[in-house]
Amino acid sequence: MKAYAIVIKGNKLSEAAFETLTDSSKNVENDFLIDRFEAVTPDYVDDTMKEHSIRWNYPWVGKEQCLETGLRKNAYRTDNPKARIACALSHYLLWKRCAKINEPILVLEHDAMFTQKIDFDVNDSNMFIVGINNPLGATRLARDYYTTIMGNKQWIQLVPKIDHYDIPQGLAGNSAYIIKPAGANKMLELVKQHGLWPNDALMCRQLVPRLGVTKKFYTKVQGLRSTTSL
């Protein structure tokens, strides 16, 4: 399996986090190397959006009710909007790569770190996308998310329902997930249909069929300062 880590070139925090990530993968003896994927940076957001004919369609303040999806779009705390868009574009480009090579890939953000060796083949599951990250410290309502997963006997299960039906409910952050070509094509279709949202909002159970998580967690977040919120 190919694995890619999104790294902001020249950003000391991101570069150091990537080293921690790769070291952790070696320590758990994963059977793959992690390729560095240069993140889109705020300076290149406009050109990248234009090149791929993408429009941003998510509020910066307050909330909006999306009539097309029935979902409520709540603004994220974002001091630099283009940093938020750049993050989403980095994931978008990896979705395109997955669709192009037509095989599953592991997508990692620089702040992920491995705690367990990946010991399963995603092709043994019918899920399109599988999150492998421990939710504790990584997502809102993290304890509810964790408890719901632990209460389910399935080793790979659908993303848990932990909130109102109109709140996008996805993975425990997007710091670590395996995506199949079917999942990548679905994400690209959603961007074309609804515009680009924050990647962890668009990748939600309400819009993506077969969006799953593992009961055994293979990664956790390093607990670093956000490079998108600040």
Provide a role label for each language-model segment.
Residues 1-108, 112-230:
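An acidic/histidine-cluster motif and surrounding catalytic segment
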